[in-house]
Amino acid sequence: MEEDSQEDSNLPPKVWHSEMTVSVTGKPPSTVEEDGLPKETDVETIPEILETREPLSLPDVLRISAVLEDTTDQLSILNYIMPIQYEGRQSVCVKSREMNLEGKNLDKLPVASTVTKTPSPLITKERPSLPEIRQGGQFAVEFCKTQDLLFKKPARQTIMTTETLKKIQIDRQFFSDVIADTIEELQDSGTYNSLLQALSKERENKMHFYDVIAREEKGRKQIISLQKQLINVKKEWQFEVQSQNEYIANLKDQLQEMKAKSNLENRYMKTNTELQIAQTQRKCNRTEEVLLEEIEKLRMKTEEEARIHMDIEMFLRKQQQKLEERLEFWMEKYDKDTEMKQNELNALKATKASDLAHLQDLAKTIRECEQVIIEDRIEKEKSKNKIEQDLLELKSVIKLQAWWRGTMIRREIGGFKMPKDKVDSKDSKGKGKGKDKRRGKKK
């Protein structure tokens, strides 16, 4: 089948009818310019053709189905020849280097594609939808070629991480599903609306992805502007702190002056207080009575606070007990959930092992079928050579018989003799005798 596909790919462009060729151009456009306006992308949008099409003719359906089935086989083969994920050292330096290389490779991948049509002299105007069907198959083939080129690069140029391999597998499965649905729809109704719908949906997803990139770029610029504002605010705050420090120093100076003044005032007041001790003694007696009353009030208040403290302590102990019970409940639930997940993991491992055994059986069956096909071809080749040999021998026998019959007729061997005329002249008899003598000599 691979040889047939290679022979088909070597055909001149005139025999390809009107196929869709995908040309990859450039890197993904940046969504925001320096002035904040989005740039125009280089993606040439294909007009939406989602209205109901007339069913294709049976030869077109068979030809398109063959191409799509070949594409499906190539995608399935690609699934088996996918490389193993890159497993390097688990150090932090290696991981960071891997992330950087992955970002560079993703930037180099083509994301914008322009679709061009090649004129077809063999397709009439009654079948305008056939090139649109071939668009999907050709797009899948070009995608496979792109993936082959990526896989042929050395590991130092392209490091295929787990996320990249998962994305490639998802894209491959998506193409396989779309092509399978298209084949089923072609075989059922002779139309290809599911392919057009899938292309439209994928195009909408791509435009949504570009919008997300634009919003992200806008957010980055806003973050940069906010960082600049933060720097300005920090500068203003530092200036304000410096001014406040100067104000504090000034206040300290004033405090020193006030301390000096207070010392002078204390000296003056010392003499004044000695004169006022008697008056203050009377005031102290009255104040002592007031303080005793306040002490009684404080004692009662202290007892009340002690009682409240005991109530709060009891409440907190109850809450602690409840929390301990909840903690024990959650620990038991954690153990049960862990055991259940472990059982599920074991079941998944068993399923994986059974699937691997089934896959090995299928591979063994395929190898046996290939061996049977090769032996059948060898037997057919031997029978063909034998038939050709028999034909050659038959032709040789026929030629040999024809030569022998001609020789017998010319030399009159056996019952084959030349007819003679009854009325002959003497000259003719003499000539006849001369001929007989010649024939006798030849014999």
Swiss-Prot record:
Q: Where in or outside the cell is it found?
A: Cytoplasm; Cell projection, Cilium, Flagellum; Cell projection, Cilium; Cytoplasm, Cytoskeleton
Matching entries from InterPro entries are given as: IQ_motif_EF-hand-BS (IPR000048), IQCG (IPR042618)
Give any Gene Ontology cellular component: motile cilium
Q: Where is the composition biased (Basic and acidic residues)?
A: 415-430
| Biological process terms in GO annotation | sperm axoneme assembly; spermatid development
Please provide the record's keywords in A-Z order.
Answer: Calmodulin-binding, Cell projection, Cilium, Cytoplasm, Cytoskeleton, Differentiation, Flagellum, Spermatogenesis
Homology family: Belongs to the DRC9 family.
Where do the TM regions start and end? none
Supply the name of the protein. Dynein regulatory complex protein 9
The record, for Pfam families, names: IQ (PF00612)
GN (gene name): IQCG
Where does the record place the region Disordered? 1-40, 415-443
